[in-house]
Amino acid sequence: MDWGTLHTVIGGVNKHSTSIGKVWITVIFIFRVMILVVAAQEVWGDEQEDFVCNTLQPGCKNVCYDHFFPVSHIRLWALQLIFVSTPALLVAMHVAYYRHETARKFIRGEKRNEFKDLEDIKRQKVRIEGSLWWTYTSSIFFRIIFEAAFMYVFYFLYNGYHLPWVLKCGIDPCPNLVDCFISRPTEKTVFTVFMISASVICMLLNVAELCYLLLKLCFRRSKRTQAQRNHPNHALKESKQNEMNELISDSGQNAITSFPS
């Protein structure tokens, strides 16, 4: 797996992210990717070789291991990181499309006053508004869904986040209920809790960023509405509307008073 490519893609999105989004990217690569690549692979590197059962029945050990660990912790975490990071591609593609359209308009002479050259367009920080706001918030929403889904799958597959010292297995072809042991269960439990905690932190950061974007949108719309109300044209329209209402009211009163009794 090429983690450098993943870092390049998400690092490009980091330029256009909010402050909370930049913290999320830092947590992803320092507390999850680095731990997974550097430490977790060393801890889980011997998981099947050192899985021992107190029986010599052929096939019993393999069947019990497959029953208790249907998917490797490392592979599941790697798959989770891929799914969680993939929505960032939506933002990257949207920004690339925006820059392409801006460069095309610049070549046709429509954006000459805003940019000096094409390199200036590439260096521009795209603001999260308009259609990009919807793309960005959608990517955050999908990240939250993926984080929650993988945490549930992890809990469902392994019956919790704690690795026991002894596993009881009575699946065929085991002759009876046998005891199986995994290597370094305490250390693996610590790493498991750490990775789950990092997932929870990332999910909370995503929720906080989503709330921040929603509040910012409401504030921007409120400010825009207030500016429109304070605009001279808006005041002139209100003045004309009030005059029309007064004329209609006066004409109605005159019609009532002139009506023969």
From Swiss-Prot:
It comes from the Eukaryota. A connexon is composed of a hexamer of connexins. Interacts with CNST. Highly expressed in adult brain and skin. Less in uterus, lung and eye. Very low in testis and sciatic nerve. No expression before birth. It comes from Mus musculus (Mouse). One gap junction consists of a cluster of closely packed pairs of transmembrane channels, the connexons, through which materials of low MW diffuse from one cell to a neighboring cell. This is Gap junction beta-6 protein. GO terms for biological process: cellular response to glucose stimulus; ear morphogenesis; gap junction assembly; gap junction-mediated intercellular transport; inner ear development; negative regulation of cell population proliferation; response to electrical stimulus; response to lipopolysaccharide. PROSITE patterns: CONNEXINS_1, CONNEXINS_2. GO terms for cellular component: actin filament; apical plasma membrane; connexin complex; gap junction.
